[in-house]
Amino acid sequence: MKFSLVDDVDRMFDSQAKAWPLLARGLQGLRESQTRVERAFGRDVLVRHIPHRIKSTTAAVDVASIAQRKCFLCPANLDPVEEGIPFDSEFTAYCNPFPILDRHLTIIHADHRPQRISGQFGAFLKLAQALPDSFIIYNGPECGASAPDHLHFQSCSRAVFPIGHDILHDGYIPRVFKLEGGNPDELVHRMEQL
């Protein structure tokens, strides 16, 4: 049985934008961002300048810096007004207060554990099914994740950023893997092989 989070996510964003000043400022920053399309290597590339993202994109993620800070994804350290939507018994989806696109979520594992995808493809796939109008991101610990010490995924609306479009063209060397199929167990098995 498919389970959709779409309506719950929309309600959460509406509610949290009113109750949580940090998210309200982040959404305002997103509305004020500058976006244009540039042509590069025969492809259209979406370029977006989002000044409010500087805190996240410049976060210190070295071992010493991480050891000196509280994990901002652990439930005990979340903003008291921050609310989430439980997902699949081990995760909770929260509004990302530093959004890059519409409906930007951070989906956080209940336990403080390292950012590792191994063994998590089933949850990743369930998220993709529950958020069909979004794309799901796993950002590795050495690939830009600002919280390499706590397992999490992110999701954003596909509306502005059709991530799957260019990977379908011949001659394009993908930095994204796109797997499709009707058998979830087979998809999880294939993902574990990557």
What are these regions (language model features)?
Residues 149:
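Histidine-centered nuclease catalytic patch
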Residues 1-124, 134-146, 158-179, 184-194:
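Active-site microenvironments that recognize anionic phosphate/pyrophosphate groups
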